């Protein structure tokens, strides 16, 4: 049996889980999320826990078991605590600002790069750090990756947009002397 899939998912107080025919709805203090139901799995809510079991033992079912359990656990954690990613802007003259639902990145181009935030995502800029937060883990990660792609960190000076905990592999510059 899947080591991840067989673990029950605890439901924190203030979070409500409803299992429908084709989606599982999760509501909590931070918002509401839905995740699709897999037809080869059985979902059950018992005494403050969600248990997912397999209906058969095919390879496809075993693969879906751990995946669907993790997706549902992320929904439950998202509506109770939320998720956030922190980006750091490194470089002389590089700036970041949040204006409503638009993030303004000035990262060495001749024009500022404006990125619209999708619904359910908020951003906060403090100095050279940008924190992206929301209830949907996948969407938070996607928006953070989209912003990082604007100016990836380069290996010589480390300039660019990087994740807060990311280590940039640095390269040595040219070492040849004049002739």
UniProtKB/Swiss-Prot annotation:
The GO terms this record gives for MF are: rRNA binding; structural constituent of ribosome
Basic residues compositional bias, start-end: 170-179
Q: Keywords of this protein's UniProt record, alphabetized?
A: Ribonucleoprotein, Ribosomal protein, RNA-binding, rRNA-binding
Task: Identify the GO cellular component terms for this protein.
Answer: cytosolic large ribosomal subunit
Q: Could you name the domain of life of the organism this protein comes from? A: Bacteria
Q: Where is the signal peptide?
A: none
GO biological process per UniProt: cytoplasmic translation
* Keyword hit for Ribosomal protein: yes
Show the ranges annotated as biased composition (Basic and acidic residues).
Answer: 152-169
Write down the Pfam families for this protein, in alphabetical order.
Ribosomal_L6 (PF00347)
Query: Which Gene3D superfamilies does its entry note?
Result: Ribosomal protein L6, alpha-beta domain
**What does the record note on quaternary structure?**
Part of the 50S ribosomal subunit.
Regarding protein family, the annotation reads:
Belongs to the universal ribosomal protein uL6 family.
Q: What is the protein named? A: Large ribosomal subunit protein uL6
Species annotation: Nitratidesulfovibrio vulgaris (strain ATCC 29579 / DSM 644 / CCUG 34227 / NCIMB 8303 / VKM B-1760 / Hildenborough) (Desulfovibrio vulgaris)
């Amino acid at each position: 049996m899947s080591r991840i899939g067989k673990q029950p998912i605890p439901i924190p107080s203030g979070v409500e889980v409803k299992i429908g025919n084709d989606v599982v709805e999760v509501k909590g203090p931070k918002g509401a999320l839905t995740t699709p139901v897999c037809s080869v799995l059985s979902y059950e809510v018992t005494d403050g826990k969600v248990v997912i079991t397999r209906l058969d033992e095919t390879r496809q079912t075993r693969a879906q078991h751990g995946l669907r359990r993790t997706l549902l656990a992320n929904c439950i954690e998202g509506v109770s605590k939320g998720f956030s990613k922190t980006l750091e802007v490194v470089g002389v003259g590089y700036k970041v600002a949040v204006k409503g639902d638009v993030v303004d990145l000035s990262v060495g181009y001749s024009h500022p790069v404006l990125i619209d935030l999708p619904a359910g995502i908020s951003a906060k800029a403090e100095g050279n750090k940008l924190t992206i937060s929301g209830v949907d883990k996948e969407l938070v990660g996607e928006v953070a990756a989209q912003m990082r792609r604007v100016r990836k960190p380069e290996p010589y000076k480390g300039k660019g947009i990087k994740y807060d905990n990311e280590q940039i592999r640095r390269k040595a510059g040219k070492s040849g002397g004049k002739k």
